[in-house]
Structure formats: C-alpha cells, structure tokens
C-alpha cells in the first residue's frame, strides 16, 4: 500500500496500492498504475477494487477503462474473504491491459486539437443530456476546465498535453479531482472516485477517444 485514508467522517476507508506498472508519454509525462480499494466500516457498501491510473505531475486519477469490460470496479461482499489474486484477475490487471490503456493515452497525446474542437469537447462533457431536448450546460465548470487546458493546469504545458486530446482529458480530471466546488475536500474526493465526478471523468475519456476514432 502506498497511501490510505478515510472519507465521510471515517465511515468509508480507502487505500491505494501500486501494481508496479507505469507508462511514459512525451515530455517525461509519467502515469502509474494502482488498485484503489474502498470499504465502509458500517457495512453500507461492499469492498470495491478499481484499476486506477495516477498522472505523476498533477496527481490526477482516472479509472483504467478495460476493453471488453462492463465495469471498472470489482465488488467483494462483506461476508466473503478478500482474495487479492481473484480480484486482480477480475479487474483484468495484466501487462496487456495496462499497455492497451497507455497506448490509448499515447494516441490522445498525438492528436492535435483545434480551438473549436476543444470548445465542443468541453460542451459535450459538461452538458447534461439526461433530459429530453437540449441539455443544460454547466458554464462555470466548462470555463474552469477550459482555462486548465489552456495553460493553468498542472502539466498543461508538457508536450503530451499542450494542444492535444490528452490535454483535454487532463483538464477534466484535474478539475474533478482538485478544482470542483464541494463542501469539503473529502466530498470532492468521494465524488471523483465513486460518484458523479467519476462519471464525468468516464464521459471525458469516451469523448476524447471519439476524437481519435
């Protein structure tokens, strides 16, 4: 384990464990692989394990999207013994899965983005399409993410990020992990890993990949 902590007034515990895998993009932009473990002390949630990446320069987290998998997390019931090897197998934590994920990030880092494409990207990520007709756009969030992309973000000026689809994705992950308005840092982290923030980051990855499809 590399680090651990508590959320929701110590009702939820989390821990990050390094898998030993890492990847490097141009500009010495390093990303490491982790397993994010979380459990509720009061039994309100099952123990979950997620295959997660952390970008070193900014500490942004992103669930590793696995091809052919419907979920980024594995749940372990409270009355079941925790089997680390089984969880790793279920998560698909293999060299090939990580290599595939890093290949996608590399592809994003090579895709140059025009100003209009950047604006359209943030519009799609921050527009609520749950209702019928035209969705509602979170203008404040969009403006902040755009400023992170345009140079304010940590690592925004690295060769891998500046003016690229990977830079767009990193602007979203930094916004959700570090900048989004929340009652407390705990609330922001809980959302970024397990709640609406995590869903926004997944949508951001999907939209970024659509630029290189």
PLM regions with names:
Residues 1-2:
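Charge-rich, low-complexity N-terminal segments
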Residues 15:
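A cross-family detector of function-defining hotspots
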Residues 5, 10, 20-213:
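Intrinsically disordered, low-complexity regions enriched in serine/threonine
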């Amino acid at each position: 384990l590399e680090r651990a902590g508590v959320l929701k007034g110590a009702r939820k515990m989390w821990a990050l464990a390094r898998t030993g895998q890492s990847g490097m993009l141009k500009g010495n932009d390093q990303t490491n692989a982790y397993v994010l473990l979380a459990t509720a002390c009061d039994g309100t949630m099952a123990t979950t394990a997620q295959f997660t990446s952390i970008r070193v320069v900014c500490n942004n987290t992103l669930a590793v999207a696995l091809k052919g998998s419907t979920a980024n997390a594995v749940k372990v019931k409270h009355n079941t013994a925790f089997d680390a090897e089984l969880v790793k197998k279920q998560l698909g934590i293999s060299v090939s899965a990580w290599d595939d994920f890093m290949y996608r990030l590399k592809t994003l880092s090579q895709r140059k983005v025009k100003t209009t494409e950047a604006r359209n990207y943030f519009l799609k990520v921050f527009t609520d399409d749950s209702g019928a007709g035209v969705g509602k756009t979170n203008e404040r969030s969009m403006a902040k993410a755009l400023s992170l992309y345009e140079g304010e973000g940590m690592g925004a000026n690295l060769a891998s990020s500046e003016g690229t689809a990977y830079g767009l994705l990193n602007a979203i992950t930094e916004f959700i992990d570090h900048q989004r308005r929340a009652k407390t840092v705990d609330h922001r982290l809980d959302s970024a890993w397990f709640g609406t923030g995590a869903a926004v980051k997944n949508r951001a990855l999907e939209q970024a990949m659509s630029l290189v499809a």
